[in-house]
Amino acid sequence: MSQLQSLRGMVDLLPETLQCWQAVEAVAREHFRRSGFGEIRTPLLETTDLFCRGIGEGTDVVGKEMYSFTDRGERACTLRPEGTASVVRAALQHGLLSQGAQKLWYAGPMFRYERPQAGRQRQFHQIGVEWLGAESARSDVEVIALAWDLLAQLGVGGLELEINSLGTPEDRQAYRTALVAWLEQRLDQLDDDSRARLSTNPLRILDSKNKDTQALLEQAPTLADALSSESRQRFDAVQQGLTALGIPFRLNPRLVRGLDYYGHTAFEITSDQLGAQATVCGGGRYNGLIAQLGGAPTPAIGWALGMERLLLVLEAAATADPDGAAARLVATSAPDAYVINRGDQAETMALTLTRGLRAAGLAVELDGSGSAFGKQFKRADRCGARWALVLGDDEAARAEVRLKPLQHEGEDRSWAVADIAAIVETLRTP
């Protein structure tokens, strides 16, 4: 019988990885709390129509990448491929917008049928924020700064912010007409995917990964040429706000993002920690999405970062700076003590002692193997515990425990098993 394996692109998260994962989430949670964002959790499974209406029928996500099926009730269901549409659906369903603007954040798994590669899996995880009801250019600046400051706090180096304005729907329609006319004269120079997109979603051609197409687009008209004066003024205000905060940025007229609901400000933050610039966060404004999903016209802006890519970046940052913030996040935490025990009476005492030390706030690992002391000491060394607490027949007869330092120089000490306070004080001594 063959060994069962996880599905391709569905990756198990093991304890060592999750320690860093949870540390990142803890930093993000506190960062969002200080900024007035509340957490929201939405189901993994939604109606397929939510994403068709929200993301756009002509996108790669809806057309090629969604995990969709019909359930036993003949309902079309989809595992969520992104978080924004679900957050908006929840806000509308529960009447949150009737209470005013909503600042929300989320974290969790998403699903897309893509080719798995480093930092990108078919089940992937995101942390994201959505500010529903935010209209001004100043709110764009605040949301971008929220992402920039979080990445800096995590210790990600080599950050670069790219921004663009996608304007209003009228601006984009004018640009679409100009772009299609220009590209139709050069059909023989387009790759197959771009030719297919020309009639369905021509703006997505700007995001083509084909090098020849990208070279061709260098000569194409840009969205900036089609922006109305109001859209230009708004984008100027965003740039002025970022400059005032000291956040450097680069204008990228080809930046369109991968989902149809974006308009006005769009942005991506990249890092060079992996060698080439790799996107770790992206987002933008989506003023039409809430109305598109059945709500009143409401402005909104948000972003999401990919956890898998972020962890790769943090590992590289930790290697580059072993004393930096990223290194502290990546480091595996070790227990304060490892309890080595053998013999019936000693094992009973070890259980009682371990429980008392944990209640006092210490991280204590109890060896339950009953194996020889030598093997237990090796396990204590491997886990990185600062102290070994030794209970054998001799110690049990005296109702004592021997404390042996493992990570620093020092002499063994013995305390009565019942003297929890003295043991705790010793274990907490640097």
UniProtKB/Swiss-Prot annotation:
It is found in: Cytoplasm. Keywords: Aminoacyl-tRNA synthetase, ATP-binding, Cytoplasm, Ligase, Nucleotide-binding, Protein biosynthesis. It holds the Pfam family tRNA-synt_His. The keyword Aminoacyl-tRNA synthetase applies. It catalyses: tRNA(His) + L-histidine + ATP = L-histidyl-tRNA(His) + AMP + diphosphate + H(+). GO terms for molecular function: ATP binding; histidine-tRNA ligase activity. One of its GO terms (biological process) is histidyl-tRNA aminoacylation. PROSITE patterns: AA_TRNA_LIGASE_II. CDD domains: HisRS-like_core, HisRS_anticodon. Its EC number is 6.1.1.21. One of its GO terms (cellular component) is cytoplasm. The keyword Protein biosynthesis applies. Its main location: cytoplasm. It is an enzyme of class 6 (ligase). InterPro entries: aa-tRNA-synth_II, aa-tRNA-synth_II/BPL/LPL, Anticodon-bd, Anticodon-bd_dom_sf, His-tRNA-ligase, HisRS-like_core, HisRS/HisZ, HisRS_anticodon. Homodimer. Belongs to the class-II aminoacyl-tRNA synthetase family. HAMAP family: His_tRNA_synth. This is Histidine--tRNA ligase. It comes from Parasynechococcus marenigrum (strain WH8102). The gene is hisS.
